[in-house]
Amino acid sequence: MSGKVANATPKAAAGKPRLSAAGGGAYRRTSSGPLPSAGGGGGRASSESGVSSRVRVAVRLRPRNADELAADADFGDCVELQPELKRLKLRKNNWESETYEFDEVLTEFASQKRVYEVVAKPVVESVLEGYNGTVMAYGQTGTGKTFTLGRLGEEDTAARGIMVRAMEDILADITPETDTVSVSYLQLYMEMIQDLLDPVNDNIAIVEDPRTGDVSLPGATVVEVRDQKSFVDLLRIGEAHRVAANTKLNTESSRSHALLMVNVRRAVKGKHEMDVSISGENGHSSSMVGSLRPPIVRKSKLVVVDLAGSERIDKSGSEGHTLEEAKSINLSLSALGKCINALAENSPHVPVRDSKLTRLLKDSFGGTARTSLVVTIGPSPRHRGETTSTIMFGQRAMKVENMVKLKEEFDYKSLCRRLDIELDKLIAENERQRKYFDDEIERITAEAQLRVTEAEREYKISLENEKAKYHQEYLDSIKILEEKWKIHQQSPKKLIKETEPTSSEVGEVQNLLQNEKVLRQSAEDEANDLKNQVLHWKKMEAAATAEVVKLRKMLDTEASQKEKLDEEIAVLKSQLLQLSLDADETRRSLDRGDGSGKIFPGFDSLMSHSRNSQPREQSNGPKPPIAKLFEQVGLQKILSLLESEEPDVRVHAVKVVANLAAEEANQEKIVEAGGLTSLLMLLRSSEDETIRRVAAGAIANLAMNETNQDLIMAQGGVSLLSMTASDAEDPQTLRMVAGAIANLCGNDKLQTRLRGEGGIKALLGMVKCGHPDVLAQVARGIANFAKCESRAATQGNKVGKSLLIDDGALPWIVKNANNEAAPIRRHIELALCHLAQHEVNSKDIISEGALWELVRISRDCSREDIRMLAYRTLTSSPTLQSEMRRLRIEC
């Protein structure tokens, strides 16, 4: 990609919205609305209302790389761009395609400058005006996300990414004397937030304000940036510490999500000023002109997010620790996708707490930030699925609405510094005024002292005169009072003598009245107690009567339910017995070879081609007895009979479950109801050969489903099947066990675990039986295992010798390659061809004599597909060709 260096954006007046400097394809930024009023108290002046702003999404196509030019030379691109219509066509095949519209479509020839002006510049301008902004890149591994965002452009200035160009515009627009720009550079690696500028700080905690919901990282390193060179040096340091790995899709695949946080703090000029004048008594005055209101600053944040690429394990070839990294990346991207879906569908609940990535991007999607998303895709048709997923992510993101808000705060620090200067001036002025006041006070104090002394002398003379006058009046009043007291002293004695008899009578009456009151109160209390006791006993009697009636009703109900359950159990036992007899009769008919009637599905399902060849019943025909029982009784009751203490009931129940498991429609219901766990428990605990045989057959039927195969492995099914095979003597039991293991051998994901838990050795151990049916199932299992190994080796997912050869299966394969039984011979021939396809097995093929069998198969095999496979294997293997030339063998 090429392009000229982006010109610095000229400064714009604060508070005025600006248009994007991009060309005709760039979109116009929505109006930010009027600035909030600076009036009112408090420490925050942020706007409470916001402007709705949709997430803007652009798609960028990466040109073909060298590998794609070589591998896809005969194929066209899977995408077709229509940039003039802002549309993208995704081809499903040569005839069908789907069209998607985006805010901008960038071809593989789009320059870095063009990408910046379309995607990031409107967001950067919003950040300079005081709004939060987010620029994010999303896409598959190796599609150019880091190139788009984090390219430093040291060798080619035209290749500079969004991070470098955004900082150039920010530094060009701010005023260094009043504005500040600070940077933090982080990575989210394995769900841990690590500081790329300080690698020691490798587990930073996320702090969420409980009042506003804002997310912050107080432990992250924050570096103030003054010039572009220091910012580029910081990016270089951060990129050196970022985790990367070599995968099949990208030699320098980022294994973490990188977040560049740019905090911009700008002062807003105001005119809130007031004159304050201070005057002294002597006429001197000092005036202070300043703003009593703190200055307003706008704080905004630009977040540039370089997401790690989503990848499929089978395509990237991740393994070991790289596999764990890929799992963590996919989990966090999955959580982000869930949040985008919830926001796009206006869901009441958005699961932002499912991942640290979604918590960090909480403000970017559905929050208050202006967000631009660039989705990067590749042209290769091999990655059509990943390209489709990326495009659909961008389509859903376009439905997300953010409420953009302007954040202004009072700058109390600046106000404090200015007030400190004013305070120093006032202190000096105060000292001058204080000296003047002290001198004036001394003069006034001296004058006042003289006046006080004269007033005290005059007051003292007046006080003496008044004192003498009042003393004489006091003596006269005392004499008058003494005379009145003597007169009144004689009157009370006469009054006491007259009132003594009356006082004694009143006292006796009062005592009698008091006693009567006490007796009356006691009687009333006793009567109330008796009433309460009578009421209490009446309530208890009524409650006891109601309880007796209730218990009688419950007893009658329980008795009737017991009778119904006994009758139902008797009916179920008779139905199970009849069905078991029918199944046994059918099985005996099958053993006799008459071929009439429907064979026992549980055992027949071991051979998938036989089961598929049976004609299905007509929808209007009568249902089989098993289906009728399943509808009438219910699966849960049938499974509960597996734990019956009566052996006959348990045998019949497991046969019914085995027949139900033969139908694919019933398998999911059996597993959900716990049937698989119950069957494995029977293998573990039962000593009855019949129960273990039928249980193994039911497990074999369930093992036809890939989901059930994972559950069987997770619950130790292979170990239980191996143990059953070692204890069994009946060939039919061994046939069922071998069939179950053979079905598990057909799963690519389970091969290592299957071998580790003894599955292959259990198969080889069952060949001692010698029964043709058992040998046919063993041969089928070995053929399935060899086919999966061959497919994995072809895809590059497996190296090294075959696990079958390591476990000693090759001698038995060679020995039975020309078996008289057609099913055994067909599976053995197929297994031998798949083993020989992997070059690393060639020496063992030769040493065990399997080369002659391959030559025989290529000449005499009755099936043309196996014969051609053997021929291609012999002609494509250099080792086998060399040995054939040595032995003078011709194909």
Curated annotation (Swiss-Prot):
D-BOX motif functions as a recognition motif for the ubiquitination machinery. GO terms for biological process: cytoskeleton-dependent intracellular transport; microtubule-based movement. Residues 502-592 form a coiled coil. InterPro entries: ARM-like (IPR011989), ARM-type_fold (IPR016024), Armadillo (IPR000225), KIF11-like (IPR047149), Kinesin_motor_CS (IPR019821), Kinesin_motor_dom (IPR001752), Kinesin_motor_dom_sf (IPR036961), P-loop_NTPase (IPR027417). The lineage of its organism: Eukaryota, Viridiplantae, Streptophyta, Embryophyta, Tracheophyta. It comes from Oryza sativa subsp. japonica (Rice). One of its GO terms (cellular component) is cytoplasm. ARM repeats lie at residues 623-662, 664-704, 706-746, 748-787. This is Kinesin-like protein KIN-UB. Residues 607-621 have a biased composition (Polar residues). The gene is KINUB. A motif (D-BOX) lies at residues 370-378.
